[in-house]
Amino acid sequence: MSLPNPADLIRQMAVDLRAHLARRAITEPRYIGIRTGGVWVAQALQEAMGDSSPMGTLDVSFYRDDFSQNGLHPQVRPSELPFEVEGQHLVLVDDVLMSGRTIRAALNELFDYGRPASVTLVCLLDLDAGELPIRPNVLGATLSLAAHERVKLTGPAPLALERQDLASRSAL
């Protein structure tokens, strides 16, 4: 199975997001990307939407509930939100939705900054492996992978998807 082209997915996601926001009468959303791939997707999506407003970035490393199992990512950086969260309509963007734990961590962090009016979740890919009841409002594509496979977004320019085989990596 070949992987979809991120640029094609983002073009369609922009159409879908525009419709989603219009149905809810949201005219000035604030974009937030989850590091690192979610930031790249958010930048491309915001550009496709013709929106040049400041974008926020979240690093959810300290908010993950699997921190004690997986350890801390070696490149933790501070989150940057150049706008108030309180009362804002947020578009939260991630590259790959797998378990849902990253999104849960992102929501926890966002609520530490204030209470948003709404949060629209946008994901490039859903791997249909959810452990939590989290589903995106706007989605590029759903992929079904074998248990030993993962998908990684590379970028920032151009954005590309690559399949990774964890079984072959552990054999090394």
Curated annotation (Swiss-Prot):
One of its GO terms (biological process) is regulation of DNA-templated transcription. Substrate binds at residues 36-37, 77, 94-102, 151. Transmembrane segments: none annotated. Keywords: Glycosyltransferase, Transcription, Transcription regulation, Transferase. The keyword Transferase applies. It is an enzyme of class 2 (transferase). CDD domains: PRTases_typeI. GO terms for molecular function: uracil phosphoribosyltransferase activity. Its EC number is 2.4.2.9. It catalyses: UMP + diphosphate = 5-phospho-alpha-D-ribose 1-diphosphate + uracil. InterPro entries: PRibTrfase_dom, PRTase-like, PyrR, PyrR_bifunctional. A motif (PRPP-binding) lies at residues 90-102. The keyword Transferase applies. Belongs to the purine/pyrimidine phosphoribosyltransferase family. PyrR subfamily. Regulates the transcription of the pyrimidine nucleotide (pyr) operon in response to exogenous pyrimidines. Also displays a weak uracil phosphoribosyltransferase activity which is not physiologically significant. NCBIfam families: PRK05205.1-1. This is Bifunctional protein PyrR. It comes from Pseudomonas putida (Arthrobacter siderocapsulatus).
